């Protein structure tokens, strides 16, 4: 029954993989990633300014204004900045389809998108200048609109050579200025015209009009059915091997960050912060320890199973999963595409958000009002993100208990299956090494096997003799760090000239030329054909990995070095 259900879901995999590679969704996601330092930096000052209130201490008005200035001058302009970063990401995608000698200037598209955004989102101030009410999270949807219109217009002009052409004697930097003039002017004229039409028709700017238009959708998304569909999709997509956040996050990004600010303003006014769909809800409630709400799963594998294999997987996965990097348990157990874990993997995140919604709406707990790094451990993220309230401590404990209850019966079934397999066969030398290597100590693995008189082909000298720089890419930079660290550690142990770095897909365009090999983690393997256009143009090797294969490489540094070597032998 479960196998048939999974088979039906997998039939839609090609469509959803294509959707996850959509250049507009990708531009939104990458635009936010580029702006993340601003978002996280501003949250530090929110915590300093308002967390003391919980303990009865309040800053005076002057000090509060000093602490809030960095927030207002960064997060208060986030939509303005995202207009530029989104335009840059979309420009990179369009440039892949253009000749290398006729590319869109991303600096110009960023400038045009940001200038165009000001027309759509800002109102003139009485004393000169302009107002910034819609330049923060309220203007995010308008930022996307400005970025998309800008790059589409530039692509139209550049592709058809609708530009001012200068004589060959003119220096390239001067020639580029005139080449950008027509598309830049066209963008500003189009967006200014849109601004005039909306202002004269509805007596508001475009940003305010878009916000009113989507307000019913935002309200519906915050309801029981809305949160179930949205956050259930995260786990459902990941279960069949599709990186769910690549599809879902861009669709809800504007809501999540707008709700964070709305909750903060409610708290400032002494009211109840009740917006459910926020970035904190996604990172610390729904993906409590990673997609599938897997924070408790490695501990359960360690302490509640009898299988040696499962205990080893739990030990190897517990630390990264605690910080939200749960690929070791997803692909090591595995949880994804494993019929036994389908129900808890999809159900646990949904139940978590239901419980959170109950705490907020019935018990009066405040929702998230601060943005935190996604690698913050789940329980700590809940407590800090909701203002250190008493209910936040109760909620964190409740989610841990409930998730254990949800996963436990399915874990026992799976553990029984693995026990039967272990009892039916003898452990091979390769199994022994894999378990020792699961502790991330390749040198120790080699010494144990050598002491046992076991030949070890993995310890052979590497054929890599020249300096090789490797870039490992995943969705956000966390999972890629596992393999990059394993490569660097093994390279140092075996004196191999390999240096590896971790990065997030989408933020790689400007640095990839510094590397000889790029490895795609399973999260972003579906983007292989897209990035191959760039690597082929630059003469860089490209490799993609599957789930179990990737986890094995992160645990066995020598195997990871061999994998790198194989890419240059093919």
Swiss-Prot record:
- This chain is encoded by the gene named lacE
GO BP annotation list: carbohydrate derivative transport; phosphoenolpyruvate-dependent sugar phosphotransferase system
GO molecular function annotations of the record: kinase activity; protein-N(PI)-phosphohistidine-lactose phosphotransferase system transporter activity
Induction remarks: Induced by lactose, galactose and galactose-6-P. Repressed by glucose.
Q: Which GO terms describe its cellular component?
A: plasma membrane
Q: Where in the cell is it found?
A: Cell membrane
Ranges where the PTS EIIC type-3 domain occurs: 9-410
Question: What is the protein name stated in its UniProt record?
Answer: PTS system lactose-specific EIICB component
